[in-house]
């Protein structure tokens, strides 16, 4: 393969013996941790019943790649529903934000979505002149999803809106929430692209507006 496990182009190092050994060790550890998370994350009850100390210990070691899509929404203040209630967003839906009228941020969002991870397999868009294009049949699906996510956030947080750099934060979350990378042990994983977007959107909101992170403060016009 010309890309690594995360979808980025492989460098010369990937073909070395050291890289192969590292990859084998990583895959073995990931397989062990995957089974632990399969036992810990219930399809309908989330992390209910899991001792806090155990959850913290495994969370700090990192959520296995195949479980990030399912785990991250559950881990943001113990679930998206609870987070939305605490943030006063209970009645707001992702789809309603996506369907918001055009805003003054659309132009800069349009420029940034095609600059996001340009060499990544999911974001790459091939056009005749070798450049990137926005919209149209040749647009990568991830770019379309990222555009909707960023527009939705700008509609939700009108004080912050959109600022250059937010596209990479949202893009990384979108890659982690990709249904194609979910664990085979995840019994409740949907393969719907719209679900991928929403699973990305609310962790983005939690990261930006949550009291422990307040990432949005770095993007405010007054910053």
Language-model features, listed with the residues they occupy:
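N-terminal transition regions in large eukaryotic proteins
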Residues: 1-154, 174, 183-194, 205-208, ...
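Alpha-helix N-cap and coil->helix boundary residues
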Residues: 66, 164-165, 195, 199
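Amphipathic alpha-helical interaction segments
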Residues: 70, 168, 199-203
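Short, conserved phosphate-binding/catalytic loop or strand-edge motifs used
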Residues: 165-171
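Tandem alpha-helical RNA-recognition repeat domains
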Residues: 171-178
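Eukaryotic alpha-helical solenoid repeat scaffolds
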Residues: 199-200, 207, 211-223
């Amino acid at each position: 393969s010309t890309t690594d496990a995360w979808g980025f182009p492989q460098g010369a190092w990937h073909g070395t013996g050291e890289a192969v050994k590292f990859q084998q060790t990583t895959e073995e550890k990931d397989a062990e941790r995957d089974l632990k998370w399969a036992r810990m994350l219930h399809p309908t009850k989330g992390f209910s019943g899991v001792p806090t100390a155990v959850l913290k210990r495994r969370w700090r070691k990192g959520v296995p790649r195949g479980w990030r899509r399912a785990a991250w929404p559950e881990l943001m203040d113990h679930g998206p529903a609870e987070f939305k209630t605490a943030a006063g967003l209970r009645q707001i839906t992702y789809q309603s934000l996506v369907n918001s009228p055009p805003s003054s941020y659309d132009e800069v969002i349009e420029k940034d979505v095609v600059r996001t991870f340009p060499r990544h397999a999911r974001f790459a868009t091939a056009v005749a002149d070798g450049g990137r294009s926005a919209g149209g049949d040749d647009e990568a699906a991830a770019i379309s999803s990222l555009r909707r996510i960023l527009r939705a956030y700008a509609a939700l947080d009108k004080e912050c809106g959109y600022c250059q750099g937010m596209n990479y934060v949202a893009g990384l979350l979108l890659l982690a929430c990709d249904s194609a990378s979910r664990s085979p042990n995840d019994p409740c994983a949907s393969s719907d692209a719209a679900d991928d977007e929403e699973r990305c959107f609310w962790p983005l909101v939690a990261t930006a507006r949550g009291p422990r992170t307040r990432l949005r403060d770095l993007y405010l016009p007054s910053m």
